Every structure is written in structure tokens, then in C-alpha cells.
A protein has these predicted regions:
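C-terminal and inter-domain tail/linker signature
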Residues: 1-119
Length: 119
């Protein structure tokens, strides 16, 4: 993502994305995410602030480890038109199918306010 290059083959065709974007639908599909990425990368540069620390996910019903992954990270976003930057703390999780492709992706951050702060 930081290289403005997302390998969309890592996602199932029917993947569901859920995030915290003000005004966006409750869930987004892969084509919608591709469009959002295209617009975003046209205006912003991204830098991850540290290596990712992946954590084993847990099934909320059983309390047992499952095939999901969670992670916390910080991403610096720079508006290329004015040079302003913000560091956004993000929590993200991925659930995978038997083929190892992401079927559900969710993230939590104050994304909308953070991006607005660098406009």
C-alpha cells in the first residue's frame, strides 16, 4: 500500500471491506476499494512508520485461535498538493478463506478527520 501498489489477487472476488470512512456505505466491495485507492493515490503519499506486527486472531464465539490476523500500525499520509502530513494510528483485521484469500477486511481509525486535517 505504501508503494501505491496493492496486490488485489490476495483478495477473494466477494471480499467485504468495512471501515470508518465518514459517509461511506456500511460495507464496500473490491471494485469500490480499487476506485477509492485510485483517487487516494493520485493525491497522497503513504509511509508506514514501523514494520507490521501481525497478531493471531481469535474466534469471538469460541475464544479459539482462527485463520484471521489482526494488526496495529501507524501510517504517515502526506498531501502531495500542499506537503502537509499526518500520522494515523490504525487497527486492521483480515479473515481468510481456505484458499488463503482475504474475505473480510475491517479497519478502525479516525481516517476522515485525519485526512481532513491535511487539506
Amino acid at each position: 500500500y505504501a508503494n501505491e501498489s496493492v496486490d488485489y489477487s490476495k483478495f477473494a472476488d466477494d471480499v467485504v471491506f468495512r471501515g470508518t470512512l465518514l459517509g461511506s456505505p456500511d460495507s464496500l466491495n473490491l471494485d469500490q476499494i480499487k476506485g477509492i485507492h485510485k483517487e487516494f493515490f493520485a493525491k497522497y503519499d503513504v509511509k508506514h512508520m514501523a514494520p507490521f506486527n501481525y497478531l493471531q486472531g481469535v474466534n469471538p464465539q469460541t475464544g479459539q485461535a482462527d485463520e484471521s490476523v489482526r494488526m496495529y500500525y501507524q501510517m504517515q499520509v502526506t498531501n502531495t498538493t500542499n506537503g502537509k502530513s499526518v500520522v494515523i494510528p490504525i487497527y486492521e483485521s483480515f479473515d481468510f478463506n481456505e484458499e488463503g484469500k482475504a474475505v473480510f477486511v475491517q479497519w478502525y481509525s479516525d481516517w476522515t478527520a485525519s485526512i481532513e486535517s491535511i487539506e
